[in-house]
Each structure stands twice: as structure tokens, then as C-alpha cells.
Amino acid sequence: MTRILKRLAAAACMTLTLSVAFAGQPLKIESITYEPQANVNGEQLLLNGAGLRTKIFFKVYTAGLYLKAPARRNTEAMAQNSAARVRLGLLRDVSCASFIDSLNDGIKANLQPAKEKAISAELEALRSLMRSIGDVKTGDIIDFDYSPDKGTTVHLNDKPVGEPIGGGRALYNAVLAIWLGDNAIDDGLKKKLLKSGD
């Protein structure tokens, strides 16, 4: 009996060791690699989850969610007032108009009219940044970042686009809701980003 218990304990230790070893490994989805950590305005973030966005039968992009603390529910992710990042890796060319329409639809589906009106100026500033990017191509990386000091920032292929947008966490949560909201654009992707779903 003692020998069996020792073997079970050894197996458990091995499983734990492997789990720890693989926890910090990069995650590759299609052609896009997500590092286990990201730095946003000096804050170290951890990859919370990542997945694939499909529309009809087409693979559109991959998405990764980086947070300061793990979140398994959308409310947990949105309650954090620390830095955060949503990274998109494009798997096909998308026109500027289509991209902005998708953002608008995702925000409107999850934001009450009064709350949308309260941040209308910030939302228009975000649309303006996206218009300045223009059409996006296969392989492009778009980051939607948030930090309490700067607000919401957008990067294209690791280069900043325009200036940071204020509006505090309200604007960024409106962006997060596109993928994490109760009416998220892709339920399967939402579950991957949260590693469980709501």
C-alpha cells in the first residue's frame, strides 16, 4: 500500500511539474503566436485566453486577452482597473469600413444607449483611429490596450496609432464587450478568452 501511495504521489508531482512547465509556453493559433506575457505601459500582464474568430465559414482573425489577474467571467475581466490588452491577429484582408462596422455592431449590441451616449466622443475618437489605419492585411497585428494612466491606445504591428483616448475604463469596457459581452460577436471565442465562458 505504501509503495502504491508513493507511486501515486510521484505521478501527481510529475503532472504538476508538467502543468507548470507548459503554463508559460507561447500559444500558437493558426499563424499567430501569443506570448504568455505582455507589457502594457510598464505593467506585466498574463495571457488569460486566446481563440479564433470565424464568420460563416471564414477564419477572420485570432484574438488574445491579456489581464493583470485571471478572469473566468466577463464581469471579472471588466471589473479590473489595471492595464489590459486585446490582441488581434488578422488571418485575411479586411477593409477599413468592414472593420469599423464590426466594432460598431459589437459595441451597440452590448452597450445601453445612455452609456453609449456618455462616451460618444471617445467612441468617435476610436473610430477616427481605425480610419487612420485603413484596410488591414493578413498577418497584421492590432492591439487595443488600456492603462489607468493613459486610457485606451491602439497599436498596429507594435507601432502606436494616433494619441491615447481618455474616457477611463468605460470606453475600454465598451471595447472589451465586443468579445466578452453578454451579446459577444462570437460565443466560442468568448469562452476561449475566458477559458470557461459566462
Residue map of PLM features:
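Short strand-turn-strand beta-turns centered on an Asx-Gly dipeptide
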Residues: 156-160
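Bacterial N-terminal signal peptides
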Residues: 9-19
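Cysteine/selenocysteine-centered motifs that mediate thiol-based redox chemistry or coordinate metal-sulfur cofactors
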Residues: 187-198
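Mid-length scaffold segments of soluble, non-membrane domains
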Residues: 71-149
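Short aromatic-centered micro-motifs
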Residues: 38, 154-155
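Flexible glycine-rich active-site/ligand-binding loops centered on an Asp-His dyad
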Residues: 161-189
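N-terminal secretory signal peptides
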Residues: 24-78
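N-terminal secretory signal peptides that target proteins for export/translocation
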Residues: 1-4
